[in-house]
UniProtKB/Swiss-Prot annotation:
This is Vacuolar protein sorting-associated protein 75. Pfam families: NAP. Keywords: Nucleus, Phosphoprotein, Protein transport, Transport. GO terms for molecular function: acetyltransferase activator activity; chromatin binding; histone binding; identical protein binding. One of its GO terms (biological process) is protein modification process. The modification Phosphoserine is found at S3.
């Protein structure tokens, strides 16, 4: 019969063995994910070149993506529509120091004359341990500079002189909830920055970018169906269609994100 000390030693060996097995699992999972990312990289590059030849590709994808609309205020779509290039790159392909979940997103905005400057912006996202040392870590980022539209001057955090007054606080909150506020998101200031900024970043890296062709095809089918229905209704009743979303100016109260597909 084993003594208590011997039992403790056996348990310690078992736990040590389990820990080593978990390390092996993590290493294999990383190896598999790196293999997948390496195989997909040239395909994405070739696909992106074809996308560049299709007018308003990203406008159509983003306008018709319901989940994306849940994060975006209706008034922002005027500027979202100027995005003509999106590229996601996984940092682990560049260096072993990165987690396979670390990535960057690059946007090119063609701009709006007299209001919004043409520009390209890259935002990097990395997994880091949180204060409570979560096992999987949390997604974080660093603020990156982006030129805001002139029409947003009143809610641009950099231009609000008195952020402590009730009016200043209100405008600051409005600005931080715009898509431009998302470029300031860090993941380290809950309640004080763009809401659910990590989820929006993951939406780009896990859904919108990898499956953009599928979403584009679905959007095209939806638009064709709408055009067909419009043709039929034109011959019949002429009821008002209140299902579409137009541009909405920011009201004094916080504007809610859109949650429906838009007509392009």
């Amino acid at each position: 019969m084993m003594s208590d000390q011997e039992n403790e030693n056996e348990h310690a060996k078992a736990f040590l063995g389990l820990a080593k097995c978990e390390e092996e699992v993590d290493a294999i999972e990383r190896e598999v994910e790196l293999y997948r990312l390496n195989k997909m990289k040239p395909v994405y590059e070739k696909r992106d070149a074809y996308i560049d030849e299709i007018a308003e590709f990203w406008k159509i994808v983003l306008s018709q993506h319901v989940s994306f609309a849940n994060y975006i205020r209706a008034s922002d779509f005027k500027y979202i529509d100027t995005i003509d290039k999106i590229k996601v790159e996984w940092l682990a392909l560049e260096s072993e120091m990165y987690d396979t979940r670390d990535f960057s997103i690059t946007f090119h905005f063609h701009g709006i004359e007299g209001d919004f400057k043409e520009q390209q912006v890259t935002k990097v996202f990395q997994i880091k341990k949180g204060k409570d040392d979560q096992e999987d870590g949390i997604l974080t980022s660093e603020p990156v500079p982006i030129e805001w539209p002139q029409s947003y001057d009143s809610i641009n955090p950099d231009l609000i002189k008195d952020k402590r007054s009730p009016e200043g606080k209100k405008k600051y909150r409005q600005g931080m909830k715009t898509i431009f506020g998302w470029f300031r998101w860090t993941g380290l200031k809950p309640g004080k920055e763009f809401p659910h900024g990590d989820s929006l970043a993951s939406l780009f890296s896990e859904e919108i970018y990898p499956f953009c062709v599928k979403y584009y095809a679905e959007a095209q089918r939806d638009l064709e169906d709408e055009e067909g229905e419009s043709g039929l209704s034109a011959d019949g009743d002429s009821e008002d269609d209140d299902g579409s979303l137009g541009e909405v100016d920011l009201p004094l109260s916080d504007e809610e994100p859109s949650s429906k597909k838009r007509k392009v």
